[in-house]
Amino acid sequence: ELVEELKHELQGKIIIVNGDMENGVRNAKSVIERGVDAIISRGGTAYLLSQVYTRVPVIAIQIDALNILKTVRRIGEDKHIGFISYSNVIYQYQAMAEVLGVNKIPYFQFVDYGEEYRIEQFVQEAKEYGVDILIGGAHVQDYAKKYGISSVFLESGKDTVLKAIREAETAIIVRRKEQENLKIINDIVDHAYIGIVVFDKHCHVKKWNTTFLSMFPQLLQF
């Protein structure tokens, strides 16, 4: 919804695909394979997308401590709050809460990227701990509902979404420039009168021109 609101402020075409984690990757597959310049997501979904689509820049929307503090303020003072999220998100909140003296969350659990399967266990532990309401992402909400605990979705702020979009725009510009430079290099190699062979950082041959091949015709046997 937030991205829909921001679309009129942005240049370029933005395609919105709904989905979380594996569903998000699956739902985005057809759009990405038709051709996109960059992907923007957040949390574990961004991590999974970066593992699947290694040739496309994946920009993760960050959640800053201010978003978390705003979420905590919306929850009543008498609530026993639990927070399940990725370690970088929780560390941000803990650092700011310590400075401001507003730490109202007694139960924390850290999740590493790729270990989202542990979320259900953490939600069960939160219930046993006496947590009234959980803060977290979509997976936390799903399991909280399953175990009868109230939950609040940790939203990204407008500023963090805009920042991710700007990062994506920069990544696209850099990538296009790299592609232009690569084309120039390929043209030079292809049309050079001397023999040229190109190696990657692992010393594997990636490209050679016809002049080089005429000097070493035995390479045609490989």
Listing of model-derived features with the role each one plays in the protein:
Residues L2-K7, N18-R26, L48, V56-V99, ...:
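Ser/Thr/Gly-rich flexible loops in soluble cytosolic domains mediating phosphotransfer, phosphorylation
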Residues L10, G35, I39, L48-L49, ...:
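Carboxylate-rich, polar loop motifs that coordinate divalent cations or form catalytic acidic clusters
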Residues N23-G35, R118-V131:
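Short, well-structured alpha-helical segments in soluble
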Residues A28-I61:
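Helix-enriched interaction subdomains in cytosolic or periplasmic regions
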Residues V36-G43, G82-I84, V131-H139:
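Periplasmic-binding protein-like
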Residues K177-V205:
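Sensory modules in modular signal-transduction proteins
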Residues H202-S214:
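PAS/LOV sensory domain surfaces, especially short acidic/polar patches at coil-to-helix junctions
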Residues F216-Q218, F222:
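Glycine-centered C-terminal helix-capping/turn motifs at helix ends
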